[in-house]
Every structure is written in structure tokens, then in C-alpha cells.
Design a protein with these regions (language model features):
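Feature 3881 marks metal-assisted phosphotransfer/nuclease machinery
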Residues: 1-108, 112-228, 235-330
Length: 330
């Protein structure tokens, strides 16, 4: 069996070898997610599945671990291919912030971190305010793992290629894989962002944590000549902000996925997101695992090649790239 464990960045080596892409979820019946054709500046996309298609496939499974339309949409948002429905309204609000005498700092909650909104929008990380309660909340979700019994139950429901699930025994569940993406974003932002402690330690109660985050930002605003603005896609969090008089912006999800083009970088990110959140996908003749036995780092993926010629070419290019990287040549 031809396999390679790679980093997310090394996905580009695989993408460079295929002009046309077809990505499917192998545990659903004939479930092609999208096709893409490479152009000079990126990829021409064609989304192939809608909400009804996902719901029909999910109906054959008793577990909430199977991919949903919302999961697919959030992978596209996190890759920067689609945006929140009211993103234009947020840009207008940004113009209003520029006229304030106070400096504005943007504070993302957990879901906005998962969507990588601040990175995708090019927000200066020095204008970001991180509450460590958010980090604690994310980290508490990182290590929920499948038991052998849970995998056995999933395999009973899966009628197609259920042997792929063997890789998931004692590996991260979906909510933990989602947390991995959020924690990556947090760690990247904190290099330059302002980070503050919560007014109390985080708890296992999400609603209580939301209150801690909002009250922490409100206290920060009172103590400093700065204005924090909480960014969220959670209406309950927005309601708390209203109650506390905290500046905020509530992002809304689009009703449906509308995407026909993406950059090369966004495609690389999308493949990584899908492999992580769906657990396993197939790109042309390559099975890509986001979670697998022996995984050591969040950004690792395992590629399983079903085409010997593609494997030989990929393996050769991977070795060359790694040799150049070891010499400090990028």
C-alpha cells in the first residue's frame, strides 16, 4: 500500500500534479462534493451537493458524527472561499469604527476562530484581542476520542468502504477535529495580538463561559481607553453583548453555498479542512485522512494512493521538496 504522511502545506505537491480535481466523501453513496479545474489564478469550482443531498445521506446513520451540509459550508468559510452573508455590512461598520476616537480591538469567539475569519479577511493581528477563556474552551474540546465500540456502531451503518473507519479507533471525534482548526488560528493570532485573562476560570458550561468572555471584555473596556468589539456567529452570545452594553457584530451564515472560483491557497486550505472535519475524503485516486493511527501533529494528513504512477511522481517530488527545505531553500 502506497502511503505518505504529510503536512498541510505539502498538499500543494499533490495539487500541482492534477489539473482537474474531483473530491468525494467515500462513506456516502456516490457522493462527489465538488469538481475543480485549474486555471492561471486558481480553480474553477462546481459544487455538486446541497442541503437535501446531505440530509438524505445522513438519514442512513444514527450518529451525529457524519458530515452535514453545515460542516461543508463551514469548511468553505474557513478556507476563505465563501463568506458570511452580512460581510458587506461588517465592512460598512469598519468604516464607522475608523471615525472613533478610541482604538478598536476585535475579539473573536470560538466559532469565528474556527472560521478563520480574521486571517482570511487580512485583519492586522495587532488589532486583535484574545480572551484566554476562549482558548481554554477550545483546548477542553481537543481530546474527545472514538472508542472501539463507537467505531463498530459507525461501521454497521456505513454501507460503503466502512473499512476506512478502522483508522479512527482511539482518534479524535468530529468536535475535537473542529477544535484543532480553531486552536491553530488562536495560536497564529496570539503571536501579535493582545491576550487577556478571563475574570474567572473557564468551566464546562458553555453558557457560563460566554458570560465570562463578555464580562471580561466589558471590564477591559472600562479599565482601558480602548473599545473591544466581540465578533461572533452565535445569536445567544450577541444577546449577552446587548445585555452588557458591549460592542459586537453578529455574523450570519449564507442560506446556501454559492462558489464558482477559489485561489490556489484556498483550495489547499479547503482540502485540509474537509479531511479534518469529514475525517476522510478522496481526491481523484488519493484517499486523504485527516485523522489516522499514529498521527502526531494537528496539521498532519495521511495520503493513500490508489494509482501507482501518481504515487511514484508524488513520492519523488515530496523527497525533493523535503531535501530542499532541509537545506533552507524554499
Amino acid at each position: 500500500m502506497n502511503e505518505a504522511v504529510i503536512s498541510a502545506k505539502e498538499l500543494q505537491i499533490l495539487l500541482n500534479q492534477v489539473d482537474e480535481i474531483s473530491v468525494m466523501y467515500p462513506l456516502y453513496k456516490h457522493f462527489d462534493l465538488f469538481t475543480a479545474k485549474q486555471e492561471v489564478n486558481g480553480y474553477r469550482l462546481k459544487i455538486l451537493q446541497g442541503i437535501a443531498d446531505f440530509e438524505e445521506q445522513q438519514s442512513h446513520f444514527s450518529s451525529a458524527e457524519m458530515p452535514s451540509y453545515e460542516d461543508f459550508m463551514q469548511c468553505l468559510i474557513s478556507a476563505g472561499i465563501i463568506n458570511y452573508k452580512n460581510y458587506d455590512a461588517f465592512k460598512e461598520k469598519l468604516k464607522a469604527y475608523m471615525n472613533l476616537t478610541k482604538t478598536i480591538l476585535f475579539s473573536p469567539d470560538t466559532n469565528v476562530l474556527y472560521h478563520r475569519f480574521l486571517s482570511n479577511s487580512g485583519t492586522d493581528p495587532r488589532k486583535v484581542l484574545l480572551v484566554d477563556t476562549v482558548r481554554e474552551e477550545i483546548e477542553s474540546m481537543l481530546n474527545f476520542k472514538y472508542s472501539p465500540q463507537q467505531i463498530a456502531e459507525l461501521k454497521k451503518d456505513a454501507k460503503y468502504q466502512n473499512f476506512l473507519l478502522d483508522e479512527f479507533v482511539n482518534r479524535r471525534m468530529k468536535k475535537s477535529r473542529i477544535a484543532c482548526i480553531a486552536v491553530e488560528e488562536y495560536r497564529e493570532l496570539r503571536k501579535f495580538a493582545v491576550e487577556i485573562e478571563g475574570i474567572e476560570h473557564s468551566t464546562s458550561d458553555k453558557e457560563r463561559n460566554d458570560i465570562i468572555i463578555v464580562k471580561t471584555l466589558r471590564r477591559f473596556e472600562k479599565e482601558r481607553n480602548l473599545m473591544p468589539s466581540l465578533l461572533t456567529a452565535d445569536r445567544q452570545m450577541a444577546d449577552l453583548c446587548n445585555a452588557e452594553g458591549l460592542e459586537h457584530f453578529l455574523f450570519n451564515f449564507p442560506h446556501a453555498i454559492e462558489a464558482n472560483f477559489c485561489s490556489h491557497h484556498s483550495m489547499q486550505r479547503l482540502i485540509y479542512n474537509l479531511a479534518m472535519i469529514f475525517g476522510v475524503i478522496r481526491l481523484n485516486s488519493v484517499v486523504i485522512f485527516g485523522e489516522f493511527k499514529g498521527k502526531n501533529s494537528i496539521d498532519e494528513l495521511k495520503l493513500r494512493f490508489l494509482d501507482d504512477e501518481l504515487w511514484k511522481s508524488f513520492d519523488k517530488n515530496l523527497r525533493i521538496c523535503r531535501r530542499l527545505m532541509s537545506l533552507g531553500i524554499e
